[in-house]
């Protein structure tokens, strides 16, 4: 196909605009208006003609060579994402073009780059390999997953849930969200689209797409389902083969046979003078909910609607599970978790991780059995239920860097294997080998659920460092600080909050271990939340509450793998919540609206920031460009859509607004999460009651929290009056904080200050601060140096503001109480607080009775390891080094 130089220049210029300003070292102005539309503009330009995708791929590969030569790390991830998009949407890539082979040779050299770049290109090479063997298979899998179309041996499903607060977002956001949730295409049209794409991407212009479209539309849903099932199975078989050339030939032969049997148009032998048609991806299945809670109970409604999709597969697994339980009951062995410590001690920790997370189920099974013959013989002696528990603990270990503790009494039985050998049989040995393969293959979630049934009253098992799996008697070692992704919390002292004079055992927090190769579940739920830092705080508390519920009784996580997406929205231009909850206007409402416009502070101006989204943008520049940048555009621009073609097809779908397209782009291509540290505060009230709350961004104490409560009252705040810190009544506070030094050590300080406000916020707000401990907090104290009495009735304070980076804080009111506000949330303002303790949030472990018993049995162990609780937010590249 021939293209003018003008078209190539336009595509190259659009590509350059997408990459402009992404380098952190580039000296440029802070003006970034409209840059978020560059990626959307490139996609809209390329989609006008099918040949433009090939031009874009060539330009991307040429740019990738330049990036490799210059070692420009900032452009690697955007180029990889753009290449994935171009190949995914390409209607047809001729085999003789060798574009994919050229891309494979270029991207193969990136495997020597550091993490996470090498991981990204490893996945990209797998994507290229699948496209060489089965063209368009990634497109097919994505559409099947988003539309909930099950195919044999590939029954995954993805649903998108949009959570919006009517008092937080504008009405245009609500209309766009409702439009996304109401544009689900019918299954008949989806099957027609998938078959058209499958034949066009495989045969190119040899397939008469117009005739194929009319014949497919005339068929019934049952006929289309049967045709597509056969075609999809042939494509999956081709992707599983090893020879790309042979796989394509067999796939083309199978598709010709299917077309002949279904009376579809005959495939021509040579290319015909036809025009390829770009086929867009249908809108994903979406649900929209109005959400303003500190829990995710609204997601249970999605579970009830989607249970018909996921339940059949779960029932088949449960049947296999019951058969395995019957075998376990006949063995008469007790569930002893530590019985595998000795046989597995010869296998290194890293080899187990790599086998389970990278090589897949079969390779992990082989690596375990190839460790040693003695290990195999000892494995056959162990109870089956112990093995299932061990596999379950390994999966947990992959997610958080921890393995589950177990009962120490099982070590006694481990030292006497002769008592168990007498009970073993040849059938038991053969059956156990098969169970190991099945367990490593797909059923970690079912095993975890069965363990929870057996241990209902024990709570969640405590977490211990993964090294103790292999060496339970090894001396604890403080892990050395290493260079890693900035979003992962660094190591630091984690002892419980106390006075500096009280001695305490050393306690070390452990950063979570991210694993992208988790055992595939039946379905994935994308949870997309819109809002400011106030809403991010609600997400943090809801996530903490969800983890606590799911650890005792799995419901959502039993069927869904949860992915969280965060779209920042400015709150400063919004009206009070009471005005938006009642749509029909009345004369009094109009007066309130006019008052809100005249008094911006009453409408929530500057009442909430977007620091969390800016922090994510520092970690992932592509997120900052394409998601955070949308916040700077006016709504009339975001509500526009691309103009339809001059000659639209007969069944062309309605064009979505720019905001809807970018939301779908974010959900489809952002697959790598960053971890945001959660913090907890233990509050003590005047009556002695205690409460523990979670926050993610900020905690305001004293006058700043009281002022926010007054502003939240709406127009009534004018009667109450809002004074600044100079007019505020000071508080005498005893403040103990752990100050962080450059070396990473912490030093406790105990002071008594007279303050009006004490605020804590996430410390990392600049690129330079990413290299330090990202879980630290900025302690800002507004101290009253001198109180001056004027001739009037009011007194004025002479203030001094100081800021300190801290790990933990303890604040006690001296004969006074104060107010506390979490994450700038007016619904989280707590009054009459006398004591406040703030620290990083850990995963719950103290509720386990086994942990309490072990702590009393082994007091000589001076150190403990805790796993930090972090909120995973999906981004395009994850946290870049």
From Swiss-Prot:
Greatly activated by G gamma proteins. Heterodimer. Interacts with a catalytic subunit and with G beta gamma proteins. The heterodimerization region allows the binding to the catalytic subunit. Signal peptide: none annotated. Residues 312-339, 472-499 are annotated as: Disordered. It is found in: Nucleus; Cytoplasm; Cell membrane. It comes from the Eukaryota. It is a peripheral membrane protein. It comes from Gallus gallus. The keyword Membrane applies. Keywords: Cell membrane, Cytoplasm, Membrane, Nucleus. It holds the Pfam family PI3K_1B_p101. This is Phosphoinositide 3-kinase regulatory subunit 5. Transmembrane segments: none annotated. GO terms for biological process: G protein-coupled receptor signaling pathway; positive regulation of phosphatidylinositol 3-kinase/protein kinase B signal transduction. The lineage of its organism: Eukaryota, Metazoa, Chordata, Craniata, Vertebrata. One of its GO terms (cellular component) is plasma membrane. The keyword Cell membrane applies. InterPro entries: PIK3R5/6. Regulatory subunit of the PI3K gamma complex. One of its GO terms (molecular function) is 1-phosphatidylinositol-3-kinase regulator activity. Residues 657-757 are annotated as: Interaction with G beta gamma proteins.
